[in-house]
Amino acid sequence: MGRGARAAAAQSRWGRASRASVSPGRTIRSAPAVGEAQETEAAPEKENRVDVGAEERAAATRPRQKSWLVRHFSLLLRRDRQAQKAGQLFSGLLALNVVFLGGAFICSMIFNKVAVTLGDVWILLATLKVLSLLWLLYYVASTTRRPHAVLYQDPHAGPLWVRGSLVLFGSCTFCLNIFRVGYDVSHIRCKSQLDLVFSVIEMVFIGVQTWVLWKHCKDCVRVQTNFTRCGLMLTLATNLLLWVLAVTNDSMHREIEAELGILMEKSTGNETNTCLCLNATACEAFRRGFLMLYPFSTEYCLICCAVLFVMWKNVGRHVAPHMGAHPATAPFHLHGAIFGPLLGLLVLLAGVCVFVLFQIEASGPAIACQYFTLYYAFYVAVLPTMSLACLAGTAIHGLEERELDTVKNPTRSLDVVLLMGAALGQMGIAYFSIVAIVAKRPHELLNRLILAYSLLLILQHIAQNLFIIEGLHRRPLWETVPEGLAGKQEAEPPRRGSLLELGQGLQRASLAYIHSYSHLNWKRRALKEISLFLILCNITLWMMPAFGIHPEFENGLEKDFYGYQIWFAIVNFGLPLGVFYRMHSVGGLVEVYLGA
């Protein structure tokens, strides 16, 4: 009975609810419940859609899985870079240890000549030369002939002026050893035969090294990289030790001076030594040749070190194919400049006159004071002019529209380092001269000229370095020259003609030169004038110390102040660097001229 009553009550409630839903004017209470049910059913679908979108976004941001080939190739590249760094580190440590060992021998010879003699140092250097010589021959005969050994060449390495200087100084060093052999043979009664052996080994080493560096200085070796790096560093360390020995060893100079003193005593009838040359004329030629060519040996060692370092950096290097497709620099054409070459030629002519007069006077027993005055007066006139030209060029660089070349360039970085490092040679001599003059006799005319020369030399080096480095970091204008114009000019073949046509062609060429000069931008024109003027001035200042004019050592002021051996080491350290600086400056100024 109770269950039936509950069922009837439920039916009655359902009936009332249905009547309320259909009666007009009443609020529908059941509709929200239906909507809530629909929203409840749609909520899982929305959550599913949100989860799918989040998964898609996560999949888009998640790094893609690389294929096995890409991962394997990346691993090989990383291993190759690590192996290259390890090879560079090991070869650098090898060179460092060889230099320290040789430096210890040379310092021991200087400070304790009884325990370590010059012969011991020569034995060590001869061993290093033989090892380097064997590696050079192996490199040419085996390494470079292997398949895919040299696939690329660095177009910026080994420019023509570097290779030309290498051959020039190598030839002078070879002749220096010939003079040394002749001098030793003429004194064979009191000379060790080992000296002849050492000179012959050095001649063979210089000849082979010059030939290999001339031929292979641009190589980017891809096989036997570690062995090649070690061989290059061993050869570099050998050249560096030869330079250190040439700077510090004054035994040959002292021997020549002692022999000249003996000859003077013999002429007065007080002969005390029988170890004299039998042929006086030949010995005089050997002595003069040795003293004149001695600075070239140090310059040769420095250039070899620079070339070997570039080759060491290029081992295992991959050069992009487009780097060798076009020339690294524009062809050199002398146009757009008139006054700079004229002033430079005047400086060159005056420098040749001073050089000839000084050399003629130096052939006598003593050099008169007026020739030192003439030499330093020439420098005091030229150096401030060069400094002003460099400062003007640096200011014009700041006004130019050309962009800075910010692309990483190892060759340009090495050029800047060599330029700054080579400038330390002459600047060091200048600072030592300033101290000696101020401490002794600053009131004499010659000493005042030397003081002014030293100060102006320091200023000129600083100004010229600023000008060259600023020019090297500017983007060259020849890179943006339209190729169609160049192709159009090159497309016209040369043709023969009569003398009348030749004269008309020369007239047109001169008119075109004047036209191009008048239509050049004034900034470009000024840079071309300054660059050509500085090129000729640096050639003049390179020629005078390179071919035997060394007033820094002959005037006697600094030699008396510091002592013979110390001043000998200072001059032989600074003069070769100074000659190398002038040469390197000419190369940098040519690039600045071409870039303008």
From Swiss-Prot:
The modification Phosphoserine is found at residues 21, 23. Residues 43-59 have a biased composition (Basic and acidic residues). GO terms for molecular function: identical protein binding; proton channel activity. The chain crosses the membrane at residues 89-109, 120-143, 160-181, 194-217, 226-248, 296-312, 339-358, 373-395, 414-435, 447-469, 530-547, 567-589. Residues 1-21 have a biased composition (Low complexity). InterPro entries: Otopetrin, Znf_C2H2_type. Activated by extracellular acidification. Activated by Zn(2+) under non-acidic conditions. It is found in: Cell membrane. Residues 1-88, 144-159, 218-225, 313-338, 396-413, 470-529, 590-596 are cytoplasmic. Residues 110-119, 182-193, 249-295, 359-372, 436-446, 548-566 are extracellular. Residues 1-59 are annotated as: Disordered. The keyword RNA-binding does not apply. It catalyses: H(+)(in) = H(+)(out). Its main location: membrane. It comes from the Eukaryota. GO terms for cellular component: membrane; plasma membrane. Homodimer. PANTHER family: PROTON CHANNEL OTOP, PROTON CHANNEL OTOP3. Belongs to the otopetrin family. Proton-selective channel gated by extracellular protons. This is Proton channel OTOP3. The gene is OTOP3.
